[in-house]
Amino acid sequence: MSKLIYGLAGPTASGKTSLSILLAKKINAEIISVDSSLVYKGMDIGTAKPTLQEQDGIKHHLIDIIEPTGNFSVADFISSVNKLKKEIWARGREVLLVGGTMLYFKGLIEGLSALPESQAEIREALEYQKKAKGLQYLHQQLSEIDPQSAQKINPNDQQRIFRALEVIMISGKKYSELVKTSKVGGLDEELKLCALVPNDRSILHKNIESRFRQMLDQGFLDEVQNLRKNRMLTKETTAIRSVGYRQAWEYLDGDISYDEFVKKGIVATRQLAKRQLTWIRNWQSSINIVAMENETKELDILKYFGYK
């Protein structure tokens, strides 16, 4: 039986960091960060990078691994996870993926490939069949057409079942054969992914504003001033396009006032959270949704992971 990989996703300021530490302790896991901003050195305050104290003895990976002038693509992330998971398992621990960069999660779930683009009409047809005959029926159909793919896909994983059948219908070829020739990375193991979502969006918005102002008190602008000493960095650099940093850069350039900077920074963070929640909504049939306000969320997630 293949190993499981555990995951905790959610929008920014939803409480992932503190919850992930509790979960990691319960399941004896090391954490792999799924955050495209945490990879950068020298970008600590504006990314809400967990401090050593906050990490509380839990080993974290993919934090502070490249300079802000560098890039860390989805392919780089997938390759790193596939290497790290083996090392973590060799130490007798579990793998817990934690973060909010949904493209990274998508890369793990689907892999990167030259497979045909999704087609709305085929998705609608599959959705109709699922409603009429059930997801198990579609998984059985996949088993008859492409048993190798069906064996690797959990019968309850709607997203991957739909994608496999969609590719077969578009290309006329087995999904397993196409993936072998065009896939870069992805996970062979089942990912048990939970996502934190707010029942009340206004609470998340308050958290975002509160955290942004706390970052300012902690010296966020000083951090950005220090980054500006590197002449290779501009507001168009990938790292500096992270929410908050670009707005701070514009303020320090004199393009906007301090009040405009604060307002734009908070709005940009809210927009990021909205995009993250859209990703989660699209995945809700194949992942476990947990309300961030739920007082028993730790226990609920552990139960979903298979722990008491």
From Swiss-Prot:
**Amino acids binding ATP:** 10-17
Q: Give any single GO term for biological process.
A: tRNA modification
Keyword vocabulary terms for this entry: ATP-binding, Magnesium, Nucleotide-binding, Transferase, tRNA processing
SUPFAM superfamilies, A to Z = P-loop containing nucleoside triphosphate hydrolases (SSF52540)
- Write out the residues that bind substrate: 12-17
Among InterPro entries, the record links this protein to: Dimethylallyltransferase, IPT, P-loop_NTPase
Which reaction is this enzyme known to catalyze?
A: adenosine(37) in tRNA + dimethylallyl diphosphate = N(6)-dimethylallyladenosine(37) in tRNA + diphosphate
Give EC number(s), comma-separated: 2.5.1.75
Site (Interaction with substrate tRNA) found at: 101, 123
Source superkingdom? Bacteria
Give the required cofactors: Mg(2+)
> One Pfam family, short name please?
IPPT
The GO terms this record gives for MF are:
ATP binding; tRNA dimethylallyltransferase activity
Q: Which parts of this chain are annotated as the region Interaction with substrate tRNA?
A: 35-38, 159-163
EC top class, in one word? transferase
Query: Which HAMAP family does this chain map to?
Result: IPP_trans (MF_00185)
Its quaternary organisation is: Monomer.
Q: What does this protein do?
A: Catalyzes the transfer of a dimethylallyl group onto the adenine at position 37 in tRNAs that read codons beginning with uridine, leading to the formation of N6-(dimethylallyl)adenosine (i(6)A).
In the record, the note on similarity to other proteins reads:
Belongs to the IPP transferase family.
Q: What is this protein called?
A: tRNA dimethylallyltransferase
Q: Which organism is it from?
A: Francisella tularensis subsp. novicida (strain U112)
Question: Gene of origin?
Answer: miaA
